[in-house]
Amino acid sequence: GYETLGVPMPITVYTTHQPMPMKCCIKTASGFGGCNAALVLSLPDAHLKQKVNLQATDKASAPSVCKAVVESGNMVTIRPGAVESKGTTVFSSSETDFAPFIREAYKHLGENNMKFYKMDNLCKLGYVAAEYLLKDTNYRPKEIGIILANASSSLDTDCKHQAIISKEGDKAASPAVFVYTLPNVVLGEICIRHKIQGENTFFVCQQSDTASLEDYARIVMAKGKLRTCIIGWCELLDGHYQAEFKQLNNISTIYG
């Protein structure tokens, strides 16, 4: 960070989440084609006062948020050595180390996308979980969304990227590694594969919270009129991995 161009400033880094009152935030976006943007969002004083007044009133008087009525569809869990669908093991292996296991789990599907083998480990984990979850399903691109979360972000690949720079210098940085130093890239790989054009969001939080993900999914499903939405936990770091994907189907009257 810097206050004046070219003048470095120290950045305070914490190992734990730090609560703080927020009046402004910066929303950034970047794309593989080099399209980058940053937007500053600020709460006006009037809104801050309104927020305080709203918190002081009865919750029943607060405006309601439209949420879709949903039912659970397919569920897929990936843990060391096994892939489960609705609690039933659909693939198992004596291999528990991630690299050989995930290759076997992918080949078991009968798929042959060579790009899969070039992905980083987090993308491979999410990609395979989505393959098992959406097998034999068919949705129009704008009828389906996906919302994922994890605790370690893309740290597994971030560390590999930093190790290359630390050992060989900046010029040795590999674009093939750097491109995966964002956790939402796994969403991109899944969306490309399954032609998903609905809501796609990746949250980074301390622990899995399926209830919060489902609540958020119900809001975006109602707003975007999605027929189905994938929610899930996709965590991988230092050889430890876990994926829990769940499909929510919209049964609101608009699809009755």
Where do the model's predicted regions map?
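Conserved "HGTGT" condensation-loop signature of ketosynthase/thiolase-family condensing enzymes
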Residues: 1-256
